[in-house]
């Protein structure tokens, strides 16, 4: 029986020590090691345009541009696809227990399927793919926002307001810092800001509304699959309207409230996810501009769990409504 090779546990500590040493050399204890004061990134509600050339133009709507939140969406899609491929290969390999990321994803999927089976019963196989896909997509988009530097690496552009000075680091690569701080009144020097290449798509209302609409539409689809055309009586029940006018009027009012309830689900889904993730991103921006290392580390951990919880909540609400 061959002896298992010893794992070099010390190597990870060397890497960790090198990272910490680099942080201290470049930023110092409180981010002022090289005299470069951290700056506060500009906060934009909509996704920022990466290119000034529109992708295409829709008559009556206008031009659609490539934005940094679209980059976040494409990366989140890629992550979900790669996870699916990795887990599929791990299962086909015949291993009884998967390890690493594949094992963690398998455990998460088993947990999600168990929840679906306990809630949806015989409809679990039809509902689970939607539940799992939405959960994993939102989770990937939330956690991509925790990659350090994603909000500070991008395109420098002129900013008509409180911007910063631009300085060339080396050929074709620039930085902005506080030393040429924003245009003061009467100062005609140019000021600049950064448009990040990537921004978490869950901080864009367009994505959260689109995902909310998909979720609510699938709730209606599952309703028709389960009850047929009788599902419409949930919204328009006039069976007793003439035989028992009082009860018929009450049923009609309840149906009207159900219609309002379905539309309110879209608002609830969209603003809950957007509000939590956008607020978390702004919080990390602010703390990173004040104390660049230690304070943001705590909030990164907080946002790690917020991203996980929000993804599961969004998926579970969708699954629960589809199972009703």
Regions found by a protein language model. Name each.
Residues 2-324:
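Selective transmembrane helix interface/packing segments
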